[in-house]
Amino acid sequence: MPLQEETLREVWASDSGHEEDCLSPEPPLRPKQRPAQGQKLRKKKPETPDSLESKPRKAGAGRRKHEEPPADSAEPRAAQTVYAKFLRDPEAKKRDPRENFLVARAPDLGGEENSEEDSDDDDNDDDEEEEEKKEGKKEKSSLPPKKAPKEREKKAKALGPRGDVGSPDAPRKPLRTKKKEVGEGTKLRKAKKKGPGETDKDPAGSPAALRKEFPAAMFLVGEGGAAEKGVKKKGPPKGSEEEKKEEEEEVEEEVASAVMKNSNQKGRAKGKGKKKVKEERASSPPVEVGEPREFVLQPAPQGRAVRCRLTRDKKGMDRGMYPSYFLHLDTEKKVFLLAGRKRKRSKTANYLISSDPTNLSRGGENFIGKLRSNLLGNRFTVFDNGQNPQRGGGGDVGSLRQELAAVVYETNVLGFRGPRRMTVIIPGMNSDNERVPIRPRNASDGLLVRWQNKTLESLIELHNKPPIWNEDSGSYTLNFQGRVTQASVKNFQIVHADDPDYIVLQFGRVAEDAFTLDYRYPLCALQAFAIALSSFDGKLACE
């Protein structure tokens, strides 16, 4: 038994010496141990006395070492310690402390990167200690994260604005406010620009509103022509209320006087449309005596439409090529107004218009006017029965013929099928409800030449109302208020650009040789009849 006791003492001595080595806090003994195969040594930072003092603070470190069973060799223990540090350090480095502190990431700013990295290293060391404390105590403490943001805010204030999105002192903030200010400025500018437009569209005081209320005002022109027009147009922008009131009063007086004067001596009669025409014609002398000549030259009564019916006569030897046309009032009595026929021996289309259906010659007493076209047949001029200035009629200006209207059909060179486009030029009306006389002494002073040169002094330009395509019927349609029943290329409506709802002239087919013709102020029967005749003539370049 003495051998066994000696061996036990040796074992006890070896065990006690090993325990003393494990309990000793001297670090230089650990680097001498070799790690296991497949693992690399981790370079250790030189430990300062602060780190040595901080090691005893780690709670539970000695207990874990006592609880672990003794290893057979020193190499496995060294591997375990190195492996533990290898696992612990990456976990701390992988975790971003900014996630706990909710600090926004600032853009890269060159010289400030070093200071930020140093602060991140300090945070990593603090996080390692916090994790170890959490493992030992198994409790989560939220106090350190609350203190850290305050410190960061102090540092950020000391360093100055970095352009952080979350910081209130970011330099981008004033740029955004500037943009908003610019936007507000543009809005104000737009409002300022819209200001004068809104004043121009004033429904109460603008001349356009008065023209819509009184359609006759659209056709009023002064004796001075464009000069007076220019003065009237320049008045509203000045902004003086007195001038506006004066203009309104003048327009109202002119319209009122025109209504009173343009009553055809029966303006007090009650009724509308056809009834008025009937009463006027019934109280007038018989048609054959010569009273129709005055009626067909007078403008239509204001506020009423004169409804007529136009018939075409193709019977006879030459009526197929040169038919005759007759205009009657569309009433029960069918009062005759005008007749027209195309002349045979003429280089261009030439229609003679008379107030006697039995005598359609130029030398007749009832000859009242004519319609003449150019060589292409797309431009027409309406004359009264005055003398031609080129044939010895230049002595007395009052005896020269007047140009009552001009019609221009837009050429269709490419041959596309579609509705016609018309432009009608007529003389304007003065304050006495009389037509401004246009008596050109040469060919360069007519309505068509003035229209081409855009010198529309004392003139009114009208256009046909564009029809609307109807997919159901597969044709172009216009609202004729039931006055037109058949489709035709000759159907049209003439309107003014200022008021497209005010139909000055309406023409359309109701039978093979019957058409309706309704006209309103400022047209007269002769003008309306001649414009309708121009649609019958063949047009080489318009169809």
Swiss-Prot record:
Keywords: Cell membrane, Cytoplasm, Membrane, Phagocytosis, Secreted, Sensory transduction, Synapse, Vision. Retina specific. Detected in the outer plexiform layer in photoreceptor cells (at protein level). This is Tubby-related protein 1. Residues 110-132, 244-255 have a biased composition (Acidic residues). GO terms for molecular function: actin filament binding; phosphatidylinositol-4,5-bisphosphate binding. GO terms for biological process: dendrite development; detection of light stimulus involved in visual perception; eye photoreceptor cell development; phagocytosis, recognition; photoreceptor cell maintenance; positive regulation of phagocytosis; protein localization to photoreceptor outer segment; retina development in camera-type eye. Residues 46-56, 86-99 have a biased composition (Basic and acidic residues). Belongs to the TUB family. Required for normal development of photoreceptor synapses. Required for normal photoreceptor function and for long-term survival of photoreceptor cells. Interacts with cytoskeleton proteins and may play a role in protein transport in photoreceptor cells. Binds lipids, especially phosphatidylinositol 3-phosphate, phosphatidylinositol 4-phosphate, phosphatidylinositol 5-phosphate, phosphatidylinositol 3,4-bisphosphate, phosphatidylinositol 4,5-bisphosphate, phosphatidylinositol 3,4,5-bisphosphate, phosphatidylserine and phosphatidic acid (in vitro). Gene3D superfamilies: Tubby Protein, Chain A. Homodimer. May interact with ABCF1, PSIP1, ZEB1 and HMGB2 (Potential). Interacts with F-actin. Interacts with DNM1. Interacts with TUB. Interacts with TYRO3. The gene is Tulp1. It comes from the Eukaryota. GO terms for cellular component: axon terminus; cell projection; cytosol; extracellular region; photoreceptor inner segment; photoreceptor outer segment; plasma membrane; synapse. Residues 1-290 are annotated as: Disordered. Pfam families: Tub. Residues 267-276 have a biased composition (Basic residues). InterPro entries: Tubby-like_C, Tubby_C, Tubby_C_CS. Disruption phenotype: Malformation of photoreceptor synapses, followed by photoreceptor degeneration. It comes from Mus musculus. It is a peripheral membrane protein. The keyword Heme does not apply. It is found in: Cytoplasm; Cell membrane; Secreted; Synapse.
